[in-house]
UniProtKB/Swiss-Prot annotation:
SUPFAM superfamilies: Alkaline phosphatase-like (SSF53649). This is Ectonucleotide pyrophosphatase/phosphodiesterase family member 5. N-glycosylated. Its main location: secreted. Binds 2 Zn(2+) ions per subunit.
């Protein structure tokens, strides 16, 4: 009877432990989508029913402060690293690295030079190092080998590939036999049209409506694939856009000799590399050049921009006021819409919306930083974050309080310039699970030892009788 009781107890303890594990959910799935240049208030310029559908059944952040400079590549890399540009190294769309004597430009193949990207580790690599798989459809940097890795699946950048084809690939990767848990999707508009038309143009209305239809298509495909209720969808952007005009031009040729400097990056933040021996002359000429141009020595750049501690940031930074355009002369291209300005300006701010099992419903939040997205992603994916400048605490109120955990999310304790110090509550929620598992394991081990011990003791008399019986001589007939 005692033996049966111990056996039943052992089974119950084992079941209790297995239940502890089985109560943990499947791996969270995340799809991060960027509509390039989608300014925060585009949501209200024309009817955007699909964006508002996500706002109603998900979360919305009204003000997202991105990083300086407010350009495409620096901010897309910030979204997936949680770092300021000075820390992740992609400081502009066009750069020069004086240490390696190498250039980086969107228009050239040197964007595939891994060394430019390896001052940071993007989230798809961290996700894969944790044993998971990632898929990227045109997200900037995902077709570059970084730290000897690509995403598990990726589409080499080709702007002619339709939004629908990009969505099809993402759906395919999420529903394959070995599904991804992290997807990244990028679309070039409304940025392209915002540059050509200007954000205040009435012609931007149809462009925004088209983006809303594309979002509607994505939602439809996720529902068709039965992913809508299981996947966490995050919709964001890299920057906004502001209106420019031909009356607000700053021509560098009026103030500087072309032979005295190299213009590394252009409007509205001009990165200027003076020729040897010409620094003071160039700096003084620019300082008094134009009332709508503010000029900084690299070491004097305002701390709030976090834009001085990197060798790829040039010795002189000239920043135009909002709506003003810097060019060498009027023969250069002029854009009716532009971005790159001070990240404190509202017109530079992008959108942020999210929907999924991890997020609250019909919840609106006033503000966050774009650096905060990275620790949020790590939390959702249950992976340990690399050192970053964001704060999970700033965005944890976006989450459903019942959101389950699979493994503990750990925010790095390594602080970078401008970082928010990790707090004890960043770890909150992971301890009960491990305490439960530990106690369950101890109970099972104790019951197992007692059961085996009892089993051995109960079998000793039978073994002695068997031994005695074998030892008896065979009776002769």
């Amino acid at each position: 009877m005692t033996s049966k009781f111990l056996l039943v107890s052992f089974i119950l303890a084992a079941l209790s432990l297995s239940t502890t594990f089985s109560l943990q959910p499947d791996q969270q799935k995340v799809l991060l989508v960027s509509f390039d240049g989608f300014r925060w208030d585009y949501l209200y310029k024309v009817p955007t029913p699909h964006f508002h559908y996500i706002m109603k059944y998900g979360v919305h952040v009204k003000q997202v402060t991105n990083v300086f400079i407010t350009k495409t590549y620096p901010n897309h890399y910030t979204l997936v690293t949680g770092l300021f540009a000075e820390n992740h190294g992609i400081v502009a769309n066009d750069m020069f690295d004086p240490i390696r004597n190498k250039s980086f430009s969107l228009d050239h193949m040197n964007i595939y030079d891994s060394k430019f990207w390896e001052e940071a580790t993007p989230i798809w690599i961290t996700n894969q190092r944790a044993g998971h798989t990632s898929g990227a459809a045109m997200w900037p940097g995902t077709d570059v080998k970084i730290h000897k890795r690509f995403p598990t699946h990726y589409m080499p950048y080709n702007e002619s590939v339709s939004f629908e084809d990009r969505v099809a690939k993402i759906i395919e990767w999420f529903t394959s036999k070995e599904p991804i848990n992290l997807g990244l999707l990028y679309w070039e508009d409304p940025d392209d049209m915002g540059h050509h038309l200007g954000p205040d143009s009435p012609l931007m209305g149809p462009v925004i409506s088209d983006i809303d239809k594309k979002l509607g298509y994505l939602i439809q495909m996720l529902k068709k694939a039965k992913l809508w209720n299981t996947l966490n969808l995050i919709i964001t952007s890299d920057h906004g856009m502001t209106q420019c005009s031909e009356e607000r031009l700053i021509e560098l040729d009026q103030y500087l000799d072309k032979d005295h400097y190299t213009l590394i990056d252009q409007s509205p933040v001009a990165a200027i590399l003076p020729k040897e021996g010409k620094f003071d002359e160039v700096y003084e000429a620019l300082t008094h050049a134009h009332p709508n141009l503010t000029v900084y020595k690299k070491e004097d750049v305002p701390e709030r921009w976090h834009y001085k501690y990197n060798s790829r940031i040039q010795p002189i930074i000239a920043v135009a006021d909002e709506g003003w355009h810097i060019l060498q002369n009027k023969s250069d291209d002029f854009l009716l819409g532009n971005h790159g300005y001070d990240n404190a300006l509202a017109d530079m701010h992008p959108i942020f919306l999210a929907h999924g099992p991890a997020f609250r419903k019909n919840f609106s939040k006033e503000a966050m930083n774009s650096t905060d997205l990275y620790p949020l992603l790590c939390h959702l994916l249950n992976i340990t974050a690399m050192p970053h400048n964001g704060s999970f605490w700033n965005v944890q109120d976006l989450l459903n309080s019942a959101m389950p955990r699979v493994v503990p999310y750990t925010q790095s304790t390594i602080l970078l310039p401008g970082s928010v110090k990790p707090a004890e509550y960043d770890q909150e929620g992971s301890y009960p699970y491990f305490i439960g598992v530990s106690l369950g394991s101890i109970i099972v081990i104790v019951f197992f030892v007692i059961f085996i011990k009892h089993l051995i003791h109960s079998q000793i008399p039978a073994l002695q009788d068997m031994h005695a019986e074998i030892a008896q001589p065979l009776l002769q007939a």
